[in-house]
């Protein structure tokens, strides 16, 4: 009985001190051990808690740490891992607290990260002979955090001791809370009015404005008005007096080759710039600095990396650019369209505060323009939307695009649409009616001044209803106008091109079993031979989105010969729904198709191959449907009923594919020329200039 009590007491003590319940239970339940052996084993576990560590564990798992440390207990492994994880959490906390992540703390944070990186690399090498080296790295990191903590406490104490400063801080907190509430209210109102936005012209234009909107709950850009005016003013003054200095800069700059000191100084300067100048630097520079920081932490070869900093920011970051250019390929250049799009692609939250039309255009740019070889497309937008852009980087993007291909700016107050920096207009454009010219033929609306608006709310309501109706009429006319412009080409030729190009792909039919059905997913078994054939070519010319509107627009130019017989209209509408459901189903099961198709590989460009099969299967089916109506005579204007259905389904298809994340690939080996696939790929991208 006494021995049983001793075992229970020893078991309880071992569970409390070692905190390893599972191991203690295994020892107690082991029937091969006697009672005394169990007590001795548990006692040794308790005594091992205070034993000195012989080697450090890996930082990724406590179980793995205990297995790789020689003659050590799990308690020691837990201690190392706990200290490491606490420091990692501390770094994340400080970086996400912008009020205290300033020039001083940025340097300390960089030192902590440098010590943790050295510690992790040292542990993963598997050399455990010098335990003092491990402990010294963690101690250095902990000392830096103690300094940060002391700075926090001093700033809090200073505020608490100064009554006026404390009141100002409380007022700033109140302003931040009010701003947050106001932003939430605006988002709720925007969500409530989402149905009205669908009926507006800028939401229905099926060219530049056809991309889906990000959800209202998407994070807003942190550089905008989420912080109080007091904090923003402080950040502005800090940026004006910024000094690009570091205590070890001279020693690092005089180094003959890249070493750990140069790396540490560069990381400190980068963190300092990102923490202090986030409102002043161009987004391209910020994006490049983040990539540079990640590259430095990866310890890759210095000769394989290059960055492009904005030439204006290089003046501010003189020391950083000079030191980096000594060991890396660093260039100070003017922003280009491709570099700006890459930066916005990585910081898409920048576009959140902008208007709906601007967001759609920017998102479409980031999705479709991959590099300098990608052809640009025509963009039309209201001049008022351009003038209302809040973020300077977004406005710079439009300016860069306009320099390459003039944007068609629609002036709501003038008599004709205007192009920025270009006064040329074709004679064909002069013959087309504009939204503003149609507005000029309508009776004018009396504009109520702000004083009258306050005096008479009833008049305001009446005028608002009139204005809303007027805008809807204008939008409908403008939508018809854009559709008419798009239908200038003879639709018979477009359908004929689909038939000719797809019939010419007999070599591809030999490698697959094309079911010509949109009711099911393309099967990997039916396309296995085709996938192996496609792997020989570079397929990066395939657009990773679906130009649903452009592909099916030719169908909108057909009407029923007899108004009483709606058979043809029903067939066209049903086919549009069938095609949209097919693409939605493919987008929903894209990951599944990727896995099943890759069984025949593996393939480096699997995502492009899946998209090729999705579009190829669709073109096979549309070829058969086009033959049914190819002999009919099309109209010069679209059937608005069918056109409205197409616009609606286009938005749904775009939304389905915009939520996908695709894998890029780098194909360095030589690939075959895709010349005989060029026409088919152009047709997949809705480019009818194939013949």
UniProtKB/Swiss-Prot annotation:
Annotated localization: Host nucleus; Virion
GO biological process: exit of virus from host cell nucleus by nuclear egress
Domain of life: Viruses
Presence of keyword Transmembrane: no
Primary location group: host cell
Keywords in alphabetical order: Capsid protein, DNA-binding, Host nucleus, Virion
Assembly and interaction partners: Homodimer. Interacts with host nuclear F-actin.
Function: Structural protein that plays a role in the packaging of nucleocapsids and in their egress from the nucleus toward the cell periphery.
Designated name of the protein: Capsid-associated protein VP80
């Amino acid at each position: 009985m006494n021995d049983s009590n001793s075992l229970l007491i020893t078991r309880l003590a071992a569970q409390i001190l070692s905190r390893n319940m599972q191991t203690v239970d295994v020892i107690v339940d082991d029937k091969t051990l006697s009672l005394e052996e169990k007590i001795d084993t548990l006692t040794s576990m308790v005594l091992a808690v205070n034993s000195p560590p012989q080697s450090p564990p890996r930082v990724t798992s406590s179980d793995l740490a205990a297995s790789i440390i020689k003659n050590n207990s799990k308690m020691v492994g837990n201690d190392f891992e706990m200290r490491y994880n606490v420091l990692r959490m501390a770094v994340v906390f400080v970086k996400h607290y912008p009020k205290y992540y300033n020039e001083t703390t940025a340097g300390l944070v960089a030192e902590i990260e440098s010590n943790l990186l050295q510690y992790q690399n040292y542990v993963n090498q598997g050399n455990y002979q010098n335990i003092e080296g491990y402990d010294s790295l963690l101690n250095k990191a902990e000392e830096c955090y103690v300094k940060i903590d002391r700075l926090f406490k001093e700033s809090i104490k200073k505020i608490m001791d100064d009554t006026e400063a404390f009141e100002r801080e409380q007022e700033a907190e109140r302003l931040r809370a009010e701003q947050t509430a106001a932003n939430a209210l605006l988002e709720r109102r925007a969500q409530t009015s989402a149905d009205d936005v669908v009926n507006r012209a800028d939401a229905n234009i099926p060219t530049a404005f056809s991309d889906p909107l990000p959800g209202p709950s998407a994070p807003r850009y942190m550089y905008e008005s989420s912080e109080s005016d007091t904090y923003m003013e402080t950040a502005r003054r800090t940026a004006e007096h910024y000094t690009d200095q570091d205590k070890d800069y001279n020693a690092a700059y005089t180094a003959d080759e890249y070493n750990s000191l140069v790396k540490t100084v560069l990381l400190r300067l980068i963190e300092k710039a990102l923490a202090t100048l986030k409102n002043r630097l161009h987004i391209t520079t910020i994006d490049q600095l983040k990539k540079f920081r990640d590259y430095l932490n990866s310890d890759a070869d210095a000769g394989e990396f290059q960055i492009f900093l904005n030439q204006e920011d290089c003046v501010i970051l003189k020391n950083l650019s000079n030191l980096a250019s000594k060991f890396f390929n660093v260039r100070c250049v003017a922003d280009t369209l491709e570099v700006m799009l890459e930066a916005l692609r990585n910081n898409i939250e920048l576009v959140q505060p902008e208007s709906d039309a601007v967001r759609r255009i920017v998102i479409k740019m980031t999705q479709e323009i991959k590099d300098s070889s990608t052809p640009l497309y025509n963009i039309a937008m209201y001049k008022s939307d351009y003038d209302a852009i809040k973020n300077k980087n977004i406005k710079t993007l439009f300016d860069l695009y306009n320099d390459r291909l003039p944007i068609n700016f629609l002036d709501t107050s003038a008599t004709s649409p205007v192009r920025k920096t270009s006064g040329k207009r074709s004679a064909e454009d002069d013959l087309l009616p504009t939204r503003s010219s149609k507005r000029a033929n309508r009776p004018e609306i009396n504009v109520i001044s702000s004083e009258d608006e306050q005096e008479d709310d009833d008049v305001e309501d009446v005028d608002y209803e009139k204005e809303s109706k007027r805008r809807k009429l204008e939008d409908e006319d403008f939508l018809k106008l854009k559709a008419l412009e798009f239908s200038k080409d003879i639709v018979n030729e477009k359908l004929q091109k689909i038939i000719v190009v797809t019939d010419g792909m007999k070599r591809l039919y030999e490698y697959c079993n094309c079911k010509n059905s949109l009711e099911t997913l393309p099967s990997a078994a039916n396309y296995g031979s085709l996938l192996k054939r496609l792997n020989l070519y570079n397929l990066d010319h395939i657009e990773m989105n679906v130009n649903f509107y452009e592909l099916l627009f030719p169908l909108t130019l057909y009407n029923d010969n007899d108004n009483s017989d709606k058979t043809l209209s029903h067939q066209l509408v049903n086919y549009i729904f069938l095609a949209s459901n097919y693409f939605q189903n493919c987008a929903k099961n894209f990951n599944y198709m990727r896995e099943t198709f890759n069984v025949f590989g593996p393939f480096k460009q699997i995502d492009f191959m899946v998209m090729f099969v999705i579009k190829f299967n669709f073109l096979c089916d549309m070829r058969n449907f086009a033959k049914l109506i190819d002999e009919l005579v099309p109209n010069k204007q679209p059937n608005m009923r069918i056109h409205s259905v197409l616009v609606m389904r286009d938005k749904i298809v775009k939304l389905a594919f915009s939520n996908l994340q695709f894998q890029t690939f780098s194909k360095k080996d030589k690939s075959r020329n895709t010349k005989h696939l060029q026409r088919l790929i152009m047709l997949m991208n809705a480019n009818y200039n194939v013949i």
